[in-house]
Amino acid sequence: MVFPVEAIVGLVTFTFLFYFLWTKKSQKPSKPLPPKIPGGWPVIGHLFYFDDDGDDRPLARKLGDLADKYGPVFTFRLGLPLVLVVSSYEAIKDCFSTNDAIFSNRPAFLYGEYLGYNNAMLFLANYGSYWRKNRKLIIQEVLSASRLEKFKHVRFARIQTSIKNLYTRIDGNSSTINLTDWLEELNFGLIVKMIAGKNYESGKGDEQVERFKKAFKDFMILSMEFVLWDAFPIPLFKWVDFQGHVKAMKRTFKDIDSVFQNWLEEHIKKREKIMEVGTEGNEQDFIDVVLSKMSNEYLGEGYSRDTVIKATVFSLVLDAADTVALHINWGMALLINNQNALKKAQEEIDTKVGKDRWVEESDIKDLVYLQAIVKEVLRLYPPGPLLVPHENVEDCVVSGYHIPKGTRLFANVMKLQRDPKLWSNPDKFNPERFIARDIDFHGQHYEYIPFGSGRRSCPGMTYALQVEHLTMAHLIQGFNYRTPTDEPLDMKEGAGITIRKVNPVKVIITPRLAPELY
């Protein structure tokens, strides 16, 4: 059933008029509040401000334009919650250095409850004991440098298999390859192999994984949908489910959870057999690792062991299968449109590695220009252009402004990393800027935080960088590229919270190496 905007506005206004009057604070803060963008309505605020405005760019772009108009620190309301948007070096540093602990909470979103194992997924969990233990498990056991080193043969083998598959698609000099689809298949198959030990290839075999892949796409859509409860968190909008989102989330979660549960049960049975013969310690994938390190009940935090394992697995799939593929896709599009940079990267690999073998992970440290390319792509197209929203647990001060407790924080990383005060020719693809500039990914250089900063920075950064460097190195080393029309690729960005390329990367490729290497 579709409800008109007027009916929703009327219902919300009636429901919350008394609530607003009753909860309104009378005490004025000692410091000024940040600028608030105009156009908000009573009670609902700016809920429909960004809808049907004729602007189909990503939200980060729209908020960047507002920063140009109202400054790098401003607010608006999405229903009841106040949203703070920051995009300057100074404000970002205030949030993730001075106020890092204060901004370490997550806002409550309905999808976290119904799709995110009741917020057991690490990136959705509030800051506290559970979050600390789960993050420690992931960083020290699952995604540690030593653990990832043990699995490097899996990454190399999967990328090699996918490269050979790409080679078989070449039909003369005129066949067009959809590189975007290929990257999605590669990254999805790679993370499924590393997490569950499954060999997945699209359209071949595992019906269960195919069902999960569809449910995963539904998750991505549902997690970005506007849900009334997120703006007005009262039980009414959960119980009545005006928009049908709760029903859709429950259905999608059932499909996702059934796959994870089957994987988990398979691993538990396998582990029991291993323990019977006394060969414990030979972990083959991430589920093996988590099972070996986690107690039966998750340390009294209210989640069962199985729930935490499935939530952890889901977090890893979400990060690896989606954001990594998205970033490599932008990177290859930039290189194809900048053939001089592509040729320079090819020459570096030819010189340092040669053309009689493929690039390996141990070579990456010597490929300085490749590293600069990855950094530059992350600068222009950060995987989370607004990061995951934060929420402050107490009043604080950002850039001299009073920020009330419970404010949601959007850090506009895309705007920050294209700030002309910090970057020369900020919209130009120029990997050379990172040759002369000593800057890393760890979030301590507040002009460059593609993986976030502070306590809530991305724990999967090391894995993502390993896959991105190795995949791009293979694609650069193995093939030449041109577009079917010999015109530059369209770089149009899609609407929404993430930055997705509207049109896939479709190119004609020709091999650069000897046939036996494919």
From Swiss-Prot:
Listed PANTHER family: CYTOCHROME P450 82C3-RELATED, CYTOCHROME P450 82E3
Pfam families membership: p450
Family statement: Belongs to the cytochrome P450 family. CYP82E2 subfamily.
Protein name listed in UniProt: Nicotine N-demethylase CYP82E3
Gene it is expressed from: CYP82E3
Annotated crosslink Glycyl lysine isopeptide (Lys-Gly) (interchain with G-Cter in ubiquitin) location: 254
InterPro entries per record: Cyt_P450 (IPR001128), Cyt_P450_CS (IPR017972), Cyt_P450_E_grp-I (IPR002401), Cyt_P450_sf (IPR036396), Plant_Cytochrome_P450_Monoox (IPR050651)
Membrane topology (UniProt): Single-pass membrane protein
GO BP terms: alkaloid metabolic process; nicotine biosynthetic process
GO molecular function (one): monooxygenase activity
Signal peptide residues on this chain, from the entry's feature table: none
Reactions this protein catalyses: (S)-nicotine + reduced [NADPH--hemoprotein reductase] + O2 = (S)-nornicotine + formaldehyde + oxidized [NADPH--hemoprotein reductase] + H2O + H(+)
Cofactor(s) demanded: heme
Keywords, in A-Z order: Alkaloid metabolism, Heme, Iron, Isopeptide bond, Membrane, Metal-binding, Monooxygenase, Oxidoreductase, Transmembrane, Transmembrane helix, Ubl conjugation
Organism superkingdom: Eukaryota
Top-level EC class as recorded in UniProt: oxidoreductase
Residues that hold heme according to the record: 458
Tissue specificity note: Expressed in leaves.
One Gene Ontology CC term in the entry: membrane
Function recorded in the entry: Involved in the biosynthesis of pyridine alkaloid natural products, leading mainly to the production of anabasine, anatabine, nicotine and nornicotine, effective deterrents against herbivores with antiparasitic and pesticide properties (neurotoxins); nornicotine serves as the precursor in the synthesis of the carcinogen compound N'-nitrosonornicotine (NNN). Catalyzes the demethylation of nicotine to form nornicotine.
Places the protein is found: Membrane
Bilayer-crossing regions: 2-22
EC number: 1.14.14.-
Pathway as given in its UniProt record: Alkaloid biosynthesis; nicotine biosynthesis
